[in-house]
From Swiss-Prot:
Keyword vocabulary terms for this entry: ATP synthesis, ATP-binding, Cell inner membrane, Cell membrane, CF(1), Hydrogen ion transport, Ion transport, Membrane, Nucleotide-binding, Translocase, Transport
Species per Swiss-Prot/TrEMBL record: Paraburkholderia xenovorans (strain LB400)
Family the entry assigns: Belongs to the ATPase alpha/beta chains family.
Bilayer topology annotation: Peripheral membrane protein
Quaternary structure (record): F-type ATPases have 2 components, CF(1) - the catalytic core - and CF(0) - the membrane proton channel. CF(1) has five subunits: alpha(3), beta(3), gamma(1), delta(1), epsilon(1). CF(0) has three main subunits: a(1), b(2) and c(9-12). The alpha and beta chains form an alternating ring which encloses part of the gamma chain. CF(1) is attached to CF(0) by a central stalk formed by the gamma and epsilon chains, while a peripheral stalk is formed by the delta and b chains.
A Gene Ontology cellular-component term: proton-transporting ATP synthase complex
Keyword Glycosyltransferase: no
Binding of ATP, residues: G167, D168, R169, A170, T171, G172, K173, T174
Taxonomic path: Bacteria, Pseudomonadati, Pseudomonadota, Betaproteobacteria, Burkholderiales
Protein name as it appears in the record: ATP synthase subunit alpha 1
């Protein structure tokens, strides 16, 4: 088509066009309080739609009624007054995603909290997205190496799994999740930490710990502290999962820690009561299970056809006096693929991490565990559980049987090995060597303190012996197992001699 013909066609189009003013529906704030605005006049507004107030504040539609809707504010409610005008945006809440977020601290709307420099992203995604369909998922077959011996050996987490970390207040829940993040320093996983309703000082400590021990350039921190609006706290986990989904959908692997969903449930209850939704058990609204289920179902291992990426979720929940049968804990336990239960009594006894081996479980991660690690950790849980039971009865006296004494001695060495300091992750090869040596009785004659010291020195010794190869993906062959056990035995014997102030012998120490 020539330029003249095109120009003539456009003139005909313009001739048929009747200019008219653009009509925009305006709403009105009828009343406002506690972070909730009740708005009238927007009959066409949709649920979860983003609205703008004339002061510049924003909020999303939470409930719809015949002539009134409740809008949850995402900003300071002091700038919104009754009688103010409200306009629709025709869009839902979106969050920026992409490589530009790595190393940054943002709020759930993507606004920077660490510095004035804006976030360098070019793409935005809605925070509410459907979970992958069953046919789009693959089996959980690759491990997430947390570096925590008791977790990797007994309650292994796989890529694409949802493993709940639950326990009373101040029992090391965040510390355990933080150790898992720090251990990804040399892996290919992108880590997203979501803080909901936490103290700003506590969040700052987490960020500083990752910067000191981990790889902050491969982490994203989504923060909605206790002082922020309830609406921001409510959308925080959805924003964090959306950021993680961006990397998962590109064939990469992401780990998201949500700290914590108990506070998120309390925020959801607060918003429901303020908007006069019917309360249910423990005053939570009836949809609280659905809210958390649709969030955590987005964690998945995608099929090879979709790139094979994964999103692993480590949600955290807080219990009251160890009550796992409360409403929110039972909901989350039924939604997730397992739970790591932290016990306050173990924590008080200086057993850290304070994992309760009797109540903890990983339903799918065992299939993703390294075959060599699975082989050497087979009896660990049973031996340790028997030790805890025998130790309790031995306090009353009367257990003088040599077999019982041997089990108690073995259990004390197990406890010394799994009592792991923070920010001291173990490589998988170190874990295999320790457990193989434990099964061979290397630690039986040594004091528990020797086992702890041997664990600290093992990594350097194995690197020097060239034992850090990727042989863990196959069953442990006898020659490799013997080499690992010999290395650990030499360390234990040397430490034992040093403790007795006897010069260490040279040679193999056999």
């Amino acid at each position: 088509m020539s330029d003249d013909a095109w120009l003539a066609a456009q003139r005909k189009v313009l001739a048929r066009t009747a200019p008219a003013p653009y009509a925009d529906t305006l709403g009105r704030v009828e009343r406002i309080g506690d972070g909730i605005a009740f708005v009238s006049g927007l009959a066409d507004a949709a649920l979860d739609e983003l609205l703008r107030f004339e002061s510049g504040a924003s909020g999303f539609v939470h409930t719809l009624e015949a002539d009134l809707m409740s809008v949850v504010l995402l900003d300071d409610g002091a700038t919104v007054e009754a009688g103010a005008r409200v306009t629709r945006t025709g869009a839902v809440i979106e969050v920026p995603v992409g490589e530009g977020l790595l190393g940054r601290v943002i709020d759930p709307l993507g606004r920077p909290l660490d510095r004035d420099e804006p976030v360098a992203t070019v793409k935005r995604m809605p925070i509410e997205r459907p979970a992958p369909a069953i046919i789009d998922r693959d089996l959980v077959s690759e491990p997430v190496e947390t570096g925590v011996l008791i977790v990797d050996a007994l309650f292994a987490v796989g890529r694409g799994q949802r493993e709940l970390i639950i326990g009373d207040r101040a029992t090391g829940k965040t510390a355990l999740a933080l150790d898992a993040i720090v251990n990804q320093k040399h892996s290919d996983m992108i880590c997203i930490y979501v803080a909901i309703g936490q103290r700003s000082t506590a969040v700052q400590q987490v960020i500083e710990s990752v910067r000191r021990y981990g790889a902050p350039e491969r982490c994203v921190f989504v923060v909605a502290p206790a002082a922020s609006a309830a609406g921001l706290q409510w959308i925080a986990p959805f924003a964090g999962v959306t950021i993680a989904e961006y990397f998962r959908d590109r064939g990469q692997h992401a780990l998201v820690v949500i700290d914590d969903l108990t506070k998120h449930a309390a925020t959801h209850r607060e918003l429901a009561l303020l908007t006069r939704e019917p309360p249910g058990r423990e005053a939570y609204p009836g949809d609280i299970f659905y809210v958390h289920a649709r969030l955590l179902e987005r964690a998945a291992k995608l099929s090879a056809k979709l790139g094979g990426g994964s999103l692993t979720a480590l949600p955290i929940a807080e219990t009251d006096a160890g009550n796992l049968s409360a409403y929110i804990p039972t909901n989350l336990i039924s939604i997730t693929d397992g739970q790591i239960v932290l016990d306050a009594a173990l924590f008080a006894a200086n057993q850290r991490p304070a994992v309760d081996v009797g109540l903890s479980v990983s339903r799918v991660g065992g299939k993703a565990q390294h075959p060599a690690l699975r082989e050497v950790s087979g009896r660990l849980r049973l031996d340790y559980a028997q030790f805890l039971e025998l130790e309790m009865f031995s306090r009353f006296g009367g257990l003088t049987d040599a077999h019982v004494a041997g089990k108690i001695a073995r259990g004390e060495r197990i406890r010394a090995l799994i009592a792991q300091p923070r920010f001291r992750p173990l490589r998988t090869v170190d874990e295999i060597a320790l457990l193989a040596a434990l099964a061979e009785g290397v630690f039986d004659a040594a004091p528990p303190a020797i086992a702890t010291e041997a664990r600290a020195q093992l990594a350097e010794q194995l690197l020097g012996a060239g034992m850090a190869a990727g042989w863990m993906d196959a069953p442990l062959d006898p020659a490799t197992q013997a080499a690992l056990v010999t290395t650990v035995r030499e360390i234990v014997q040397r430490l034992t001699l040093e403790a007795a102030n006897v010069p260490a012998r040279t040679g193999s120490g056999k």
